[in-house]
Structures are given as structure tokens and as C-alpha cells.
Design a protein with these regions (language model features):
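Single conserved hydrophobic/aromatic residue that forms the stacking wall/gate
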Residues: 1-9, 13
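Alpha-helical scaffolding flanking metal-ion-dependent phosphate/phosphodiester catalytic sites
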Residues: 10-125
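Alpha-helical interaction/regulatory segments in DNA maintenance proteins
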Residues: 128-132
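Intrinsically disordered or compositionally simple regulatory linkers and C-terminal tails
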Residues: 134-140
């Protein structure tokens, strides 16, 4: 689920925004946030894929309620969205991009743990980190 969403974001957002090395302007950030709506529209055309829409819509919600698009908090964020949020952020940190070097797995794990309970579901972060340490999550 995560990879197709990342590819969709790349298809719908201008490269000048995706590869920008400096801070996004308010306008660019608003454009970047449209990938949630665009992804949802694309999924509606795929047979038998409606079940992933809550995860797609909610993957930028934050556990403390400060995310978007609806400002949901805690258990009100769909379960799969809470998982996707962790995977998406971990990938964003550990993947090399044209505008940044990949961060180490150790650094990414520390960031997940540091933001556990605010940005991320603390129970799911703990499980995600356990799976990394057990070698059950493949890291490319």
C-alpha cells in the first residue's frame, strides 16, 4: 500500500516541489497535501480497493490530533492509517532522495520513539521497532 501511494504522490506533484531542497512555501505545502485527495480519487476507480481509503485519508493524521486532513487523534485515527503513518515516515527518513541522503535505521528508530505518543501511536511504534530488531521488516 505504501509504495503505490508514494508513486502516486510523485505523479501528481510537480518535481520542483518534490525535489526542493529548501523549506516549502505555504502554497507548495498546500499543493503537497493534495496527494491525499488525489490518491483517494484514484483508488475509487480500482475494483475492490475501497477498504484502503480510510488508511490513505488518515496517513497524515497525528496521534495527538494535530495532523490533517481532519485533525483526528488517538484511536479515532483508522488503525491502518496509524500503521501507514509509521511506515511512510520511516521510509521518508531511511530512503535516499534527490534532495537528501538516507538517514540511518538507528536514527529513524530514535525519531519514531521520540515522537511516539505525539505523532505516532505508541503501541504500534513499539511493535514496529521490535519487528525491525527481529529482522522481520526488510530495509532496502
Amino acid at each position: 500500500l505504501h509504495y503505490p501511494l508514494r508513486r502516486q504522490r510523485q505523479m501528481c506533484i510537480r518535481d520542483s516541489i518534490l525535489q526542493k531542497t529548501s523549506k516549502l512555501t505555504d502554497e507548495e505545502y498546500a499543493i503537497m497535501k493534495t496527494h491525499v485527495e488525489n490518491s483517494t480519487k484514484m483508488i475509487r476507480y480500482l475494483p475492490d480497493m475501497d477498504y484502503v481509503i480510510p488508511a490513505v485519508v488518515g496517513h497524515h493524521e497525528r496521534y495527538d490530533g494535530t495532523g490533517y486532513p481532519r485533525g483526528l487523534a488517538g484511536q479515532n485515527i483508522p488503525y491502518m492509517a496509524r500503521i501507514l503513518t509509521i511506515a511512510d515516515c520511516f521510509d521518508a527518513m531511511t530512503a535516499k532522495r534527490p534532495y537528501k541522503q538516507a538517514l540511518s535505521v538507528e536514527y529513524a528508530v530514535n525519531e519514531l520513539e521520540k515522537n511516539s505518543g505525539t505523532q505516532f501511536d505508541p503501541v504500534l511504534v513499539k511493535k514496529f521497532v521490535e519487528l525491525i530488531h527481529e529482522g522481520k521488516i526488510s530495509i532496502a
